[in-house]
């Protein structure tokens, strides 16, 4: 990589970092769908990974995780202990598992999105729609990576505590997890796929000029 490209990538990474931070702490990180607010904070991570590569994707995901850690530590809600080891809500407190939930899925968002994008491009070689389909698949895959890993890690590491804190439940906790994945995760993945296609294609055109 020449110096010019390296500088360009660092500037783009800084812009994506700024977007993630702004979206994490303002309403810009959410799109109202009527029945829910779709989280789109992970979209800059996905797009950054596609444009800059998996290493930058992992870095941007780490920034997303750090904003989540800070927010859940300093602006806690009843279930913030699953995202921060520094939070204790009544009889429930966070631990090392909280850091795993907060950081690992977010770091993997960009890495998964990048390799899905490249894999679909290769699989559809020769198709006029290959880039559009690959971008949509990367957006959906990156979003679902976050949702599926976060919610399943919550269940395996804090199942009973999360059920009690969130819904006052001691049984049927995984049904709640599945409900959240279906009601929140799937619409968010669709939105992420649409935004990834629209924004990344526009960025590709700008970068070619």
PLM segments and residue spans:
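Loop-helix junctions at membrane interfaces
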Residues: 1-209
């Amino acid at each position: 990589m020449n110096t010019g490209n390296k500088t360009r990538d660092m500037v783009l990474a800084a812009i994506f970092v700024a977007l993630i931070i702004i979206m994490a702490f303002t309403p810009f990180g959410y799109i109202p769908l009527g029945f829910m607010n779709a989280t789109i904070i992970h979209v800059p991570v996905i797009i950054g990974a596609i444009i800059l590569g998996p290493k930058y994707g992992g870095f941007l995901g780490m920034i997303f995780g750090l904003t989540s850690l800070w927010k859940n530590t300093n602006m806690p809600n009843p279930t913030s202990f699953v995202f921060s080891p520094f939070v204790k809500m009544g009889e429930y407190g966070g631990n090392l598992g909280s850091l795993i939930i907060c950081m690992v899925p977010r770091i993997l968002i960009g890495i998964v999105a990048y390799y899905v994008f490249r894999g679909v491009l290769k699989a559809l070689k020769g198709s006029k729609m290959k880039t559009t389909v690959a971008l949509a698949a990367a957006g959906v895959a990156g979003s679902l990576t976050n949702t599926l890993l976060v919610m399943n890690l919550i269940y395996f590491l804090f199942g009973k505590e999360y059920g009690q804190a969130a819904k006052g439940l001691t049984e049927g906790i995984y049904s709640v997890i599945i409900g959240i994945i279906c009601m929140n995760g799937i619409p968010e993945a669709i939105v992420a796929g649409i935004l990834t296609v629209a924004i990344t294609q526009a960025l590709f055109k700008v970068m070619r000029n």
